[in-house]
């Protein structure tokens, strides 16, 4: 049966404080303690599960390893040989590929043959919402992201001031141990020091032995002009710090563009709906439309129908990989007047009568519709 997440067992968040973890454990321990639940196997299992979770999460080093690698980081059996997990396979062949490429299987580089494993830090993702105008023109901004930094109290050693990490007695500072499985000799991460080659008898109270603390970091981010929704900006080296001297990961800023009140974006092109008076549609005229660069005007020919699309070249967005801007497509919607006065009604009736008497032509759409209706009734 797969182990449950330790945070889930205690019912706390992953960023829970030591006090919150201790309080949650005490509550569960009192509830499921064997003395309170004699001959209750289910309560006994819950008690053992809570005890194990507390032992791992109350220890700074073990908690850091668990946060990074899950159960495999704190349970040596999960990375063993004999097909019990992918970690065992990686460790079995790590020395061979490490000697050739300088990197062990599974992405863990080694400081040297038999030395502690070196891991690249995890990448981080930051979701950022910007306006269409900001995406079109680009701009510089700052973001604040939580980040792990070296502990100022122990200077990153993880040890209580006045003490220092000691050589791991299990692996003798190698970071790995060898296990014999029949004809095979398999090398795996040391279960006591988790590959560091050292252990900390007296952990730093400030960082709980991890050698790092979380703080908010302010970063400068340059949003390039023409960026589109869903694109990511890479900030090299601003991810999680590496382990055992490994390189840090990267930060990826994922861009999301807010819906615009006027425009819809389609690649480098923009679309907008433009209402126009029915008199302008019938008589023609000049209309003014908004663009991201200001206002622009263009002529509307007489007899313009609702739904007609006009293309304004170069009034869209200049994309990241384009030297010219896209176009703006204006979709006109002819407005029908409402709440007419008596005088306006009379004028429209006279106008309607003049159309019939004067033989004014219908629009192409209505003419086609009338022709189809005529053939339908014949």
UniProtKB/Swiss-Prot annotation:
Zinc finger extent (CR-type): 138-216
Name of this chain's protein: Chaperone protein DnaJ
PANTHER family assigned: CHAPERONE PROTEIN DNAJ, DNAJ HOMOLOG 1, MITOCHONDRIAL-RELATED
GO biological process: chaperone cofactor-dependent protein refolding; DNA replication; protein refolding; response to heat
GO cellular component terms attached to this protein's record: cytoplasm
Cofactor dependence: Zn(2+)
Keyword terms: Chaperone, Cytoplasm, DNA replication, Metal-binding, Repeat, Stress response, Zinc, Zinc-finger
Family statement: Belongs to the DnaJ family.
CDD domains linked: DnaJ, DnaJ_C, DnaJ_zf
Cofactor note: Binds 2 Zn(2+) ions per monomer.
Domain text: The J domain is necessary and sufficient to stimulate DnaK ATPase activity. Zinc center 1 plays an important role in the autonomous, DnaK-independent chaperone activity of DnaJ. Zinc center 2 is essential for interaction with DnaK and for DnaJ activity.
Boundaries of every J domain copy: 5-70
